[in-house]
A protein has these predicted regions:
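SAM-dependent methyltransferase catalytic region
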Residues: 1-200
Length: 200
């Protein structure tokens, strides 16, 4: 959500200013990704990859390019079909498709998806989060169904799904910090979440 991105940027600026009084003179921009919906027509992905490099076409890449249709609903809970895609992103970013307006539009959307997926790759030494607290009754029907399909062990509450996902975003032996209710430590509905952390 764009407002959350702006608040995150503001918080980072204020923390940096607290540590370094001349920070505002440095013209430094925070590295924040606000996930956006990106959609493709059925034929567009194949046409695009055939034009830029047919060897790149795989079912995994095709699936990935269609995973951000509802990014505003699922957010960073999305698990990209491909991870560690920086090389692929660099390769496609270097492709010139400016001669074809149709391909240029698809190209920009593909780069946006890959950039967003790169942010959601497991590469972080530290993950700190204040996951949203929302039980199943508060979720829209699409999110509730999607959670059951993708986070079946922790579907009872949105914050527990985010705790699992944030753990996946960290490198092995990474540091994690959550602002979360304590209920997951003792309620039976969070037993699988407790097992998840014990087994990590």
């Amino acid at each position: 959500d764009e407002r959350a991105g702006e608040l995150a940027a503001f918080a980072l600026f204020m923390k940096a200013r607290e540590k370094y009084r001349r920070f505002f003179k440095k013209n430094i921009q925070p590295n924040i990704c606000v996930l956006e919906n990106v959609t493709f027509e059925n034929h567009e992905v194949r046409s695009y990859l055939d034009a830029v490099n047919p060897d790149l076409f795989t079912m995994e890449l095709s699936t990935l390019l269609n995973q951000f249709k509802e990014a505003d609903n699922f957010g960073s809970l999305i698990r990209p079909e491909l991870t560690n895609i920086s090389d692929l992103l660099r390769l496609l970013d270097e492709k010139k498709v400016s001669d074809d307006m149709f391909l240029q539009d698809i190209h920009q959307r593909a780069l946006k998806v890959l950039n967003q997926a790169d942010y959601l790759s497991p590469k972080y030494h530290v993950v700190v989060a204040n996951p949203p607290y929302m039980g199943g009754k508060g979720m829209n029907s699409r999110l509730g169904t999607w959670l059951k399909d993708n986070y079946s062990d922790v579907k009872s509450d949105l914050f527990s799904a985010f705790m699992v996902r944030n753990t996946e975003l960290s490198l092995q032996k990474g540091q994690l910090g959550f602002m979360s209710p304590f209920v997951w430590m003792f309620l039976s509905s969070y037993k699988k979440l407790r097992k998840f952390f014990i087994n990590k």
